Structures are given as structure tokens and as C-alpha cells.
Amino acid sequence: MLDIDKSTVDFLVTENMVQEVEKVLSHDVPLVHTIVEEMVKRDIDRIYFVACGSPLNAAQTAKHLADRFSDLQVYAISGWEFCDNTPYRLDDRCAVIGVSDYGKTEEVIKALELGRACGALTAAFTKRADSPITSAAEFSIDYQADCIWEIHLLLCYSVVLEMITRLAPHAEIGKIKNDLKQLPNALGHLVRTWEEKGRQLGEQASQWPMIYTVAAGPLRPLGYKEGIVTLMEFTWTHGCVIESGEFRHGPLEIVEPGRSVPVSARQ
């Protein structure tokens, strides 16, 4: 297992994420609210989040929120899927929101250009103000931080939360907004108290040649992020992600004794 000096990299879990999330909550979420205000003025009733990899998973989680607590039409679509199979309805009552950390994802930029050409409101969420994606969108937010899962989730969540608040208030939405304010403290606690346990689990998992990740509901996108983005991209571990309700319908038949099956199926 790699022994990495966390002070030399910016993509690992560190206490810096606490300050980054605090900054996003205080500075960037209000910017999202400004964009939503414009969406409401334009009678936007359909939102397309377009992204790839981890940002797409964050957008999918926000879509789940919209589906559960509202009748908003919210979609989370991979970049090339949006470009190659462009939704039939793409007009001036739609919003296309592109999410790309480094801001150069070709298909996400193209999706924004398609949306803008059809009259849709377009917005980009990215790390830097000079990223190419910002020139393709009418609105942009450059969050200037590294803990992208938390940031993308907060920004996409904030779009949906604010839209529901303004158009069709739901009792649970206020509770969720209040809970999000506790996120920095919760993250700090997890970083301080779980790192050693995580290291021990990582050492154990490093011996496994393949890992199945099983999840459902709002945790299914997170399951994909961990099972594919983290395990395959970052650690080169073979594996797949399976919806928990489908696990017993076939996949369970090939699970061998001793094979690891991480489960993230609870809310």
C-alpha cells in the first residue's frame, strides 16, 4: 500500500476541506441562489445537470433530492450522452448546468454550447475563473477549492433546494438546509476520528483483487464514485457497482467466499 505524504497532494481527505466547505457555504451558495433567482424569473421548469465522473455522481444525488421532494424536472446526464442523444426538449424554459472541476471537459463545454444555442439558461461550476467552460456559459461559479465531492454536491444540492423553496416549499427542505450548515463540523470530526480506522481498512482491502460496491437510493451515486472513480481510477482496483435490489438477481451467484462487498445502502 502506498505511504503518501498528505501535505504534498490536494485530492485526499484532509482538514482543509472544512475551511473549503465553510467558504462554499458562505460565498458560493449565495451565488447559486442568484442564478436560481434568474431561473425563476425565466420560468425555468426543467434542469439538465451535465457532467462526467464524480461531478456527475454529485448531480445524480441532487436529482434524487428533486425527485423525492418535488415535481421539478431534473436530469443528470453524462456529457457525451447529452451531446449525442440531445433531449428533444431544450428551449428557453430549460437550464443546462455544466459541472467540471478543471473546466476543460470537452463534452460538458459542448453541452453548454448546445443549450445556449437553443435559448436555455446556462451555468458552469468549476474551480477556476479562467477555465474554458466559463466562456461557454451565461453564468459561472469558480469555487477555488479541492474537495470536489463536497463542493459539487453542495452546489448542485443548492440549485435544487432553492428551486423547491421558491416554487413548491416542502417541510423537509428547511431541515436539510439547516443540516448542511453542520457539514463543516461533521467533516472535521470524521477527519480527526476516522483516519486511522480508514488506514486499517485500506490495508486490509489492498489485498483484495476485486471489490463489488453495493448501494441504493441517494447513496447509489456515491457508490459509483467510490467503486469506480476512487477504486478503479485512483487505486487501480478491479470492481463494479451494483444496485442493492439487483444484487441478488444474478451477481450474488458469482460472489466467492472471502470476496469483499462494501455496502453503502442506508440513508
What residue ranges belong to the model's regions?
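Active-site phosphate/pyrophosphate-binding segments
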Residues: 6-45, 141, 147-148, 162-244, ...
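Generic preference for hydrophobic/aromatic residues in regular secondary structure cores
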Residues: 25, 74, 187, 262-263
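Short amphipathic alpha-helical surface micro-motifs
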Residues: 30-31, 57, 78-79, 121-125, ...
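Glycine-rich phosphate-binding loops that contact phosphosugars or nucleotide phosphates
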Residues: 42-179, 183, 258, 265-267
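A short, well-structured beta->alpha microelement
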Residues: 73-85, 240-253
